[in-house]
Regions:
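Beta-turn initiation residues at beta-strand->coil junctions
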Residues: 47-49, 82, 103-107, 208-212
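An acidic-aromatic
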Residues: 71-130
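Bacterial Sec-dependent N-terminal signal peptides
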Residues: 1-26
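N-terminal leader/targeting segments and the immediate start of mature chains
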Residues: 19-69, 142-149
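Extended beta-strand-rich segments in extracellular/periplasmic secretory proteins, especially
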Residues: 130-200, 279
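Conserved helix-turn-beta segment immediately C-terminal to the redox Cys motif
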Residues: 289-290, 305
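Single conserved hydrophobic/aromatic residue that forms the stacking wall/gate
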Residues: 298-307
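Non-transmembrane domains of secretory- and envelope-associated proteins
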Residues: 184-191, 200-279, 286
Length: 307
């Protein structure tokens, strides 16, 4: 009798768990469908960057985003422009599916990157909010990776958590990418993504990404959707008229540096350094024909500095 009761309880528990999982999956499918219906979106976003263990954000940026679904783009499947939230005529970043545009306001230059300089296996383009959220949910519903998910009712919104337990960290540049491991041990490779979904429209309004080395949080407001299409988007419309347009690769062209052989016989420039007693020593004070200079560099990492 007791065994039958125990088996009944276990069976009921399995049924309840299965029903909850099915309900979670069906709701995520609904949210994904809503995200896939977005052809364009404008919104304000606050982006925060954190270091794990810190109590305050390392940086906080406020932007106004115009995001467009772009099926022709094979990288992230979207194009977008990021503008200063306090001055929406001031360009911060732009990606149209072919190029990315990086403004350098201090010297009035626009760097155009066509991704031919230092090409990578995929374009490192940070996706806009709704494109990112869409690909996170699609991955959660379809992946064969080792994941755990949670969907929780929090009153006015649902909280969704995705934990990816793989041997490599997973980032989303459009689709999910398992990032190559560095040559040193990074510790945990767990990737965590969290979404807060508004019940009023079944769309995410906040997302959080956590890796061992970095945490980022994005929060949207003043959302307007489907008032434009990708055909209304032209990156050059956001170029400041008085800025010089340069190639991104030109920013990294180094001037020819003198070789050691070309310095032989040349007069050394004057300099002043400190000796091991922290006393200043100048070149003019040195009378020897040959001088040995020993330079030491001490690097203090963030964890050491905090401690």
């Amino acid at each position: 009798m007791k065994i039958k009761l125990l088996l009944t309880i276990l069976l009921l528990a399995e049924i309840i768990t299965a029903n909850a999982q099915n309900a979670e999956k069906e709701y995520l499918k609904k949210v994904l469908t809503n995200l896939e219906k977005i052809e364009s979106a404008t919104y304000y976003v606050t982006n925060e960057s954190w270091q794990p263990g810190d109590s305050t954000a390392l940086s906080t940026l406020h932007s106004f985003i115009k995001e467009y679904d772009n099926p022709m783009d094979s990288t992230i499947g979207a194009s977008y422009v990021s503008l200063d939230a306090n001055d929406t005529t001031k360009l911060e970043f732009c990606y149209d599916g072919n190029i990315r545009v990086l403004p350098y306001h201090e010297n009035k230059k626009l760097a155009i990157d066509d991704f031919t300089f230092r090409p990578l296996p995929f374009r490192l383009v940070s996706p806009p909010f709704f494109n990112h959220a869409k690909n996170i949910i699609r991955y959660a519903l379809t992946t064969k990776d080792h994941i755990a998910t949670e969907l929780k009712d929090e009153g006015d919104n649902y909280y969704f958590k995705l934990v990816i337990d793989e041997n490599q960290q997973v980032e989303f540049f459009g689709k999910a990418y398992h990032m190559p491991l560095p040559p040193f041990d990074i510790g945990s490779t767990t990737s965590i993504y969290e979404l807060w979904i508004n019940k009023s429209n079944d769309l995410p309004y906040k997302k959080r990404r956590e890796m061992l080395h970095d945490i980022s949080v994005s929060t949207c407001s003043n959302l307007a959707i489907n008032r434009h299409t990708i055909y209304d988007f032209n990156a050059s419309d956001y170029f400041p008229k008085d800025y010089e347009i340069v190639k991104y690769s030109d920013l990294y062209k180094k001037k020819a540096e003198p070789t050691a052989s070309s310095l032989i016989g040349k007069k050394a420039p004057g300099w002043i350094l400190e000796n091991i007693e922290a006393q200043p020593v100048s070149l003019a004070d040195c009378k020897s024909k040959i001088i040995l200079i020993n330079l030491s560099l001490i690097h203090i990492s963030e964890p050491t500095r905090r401690s």
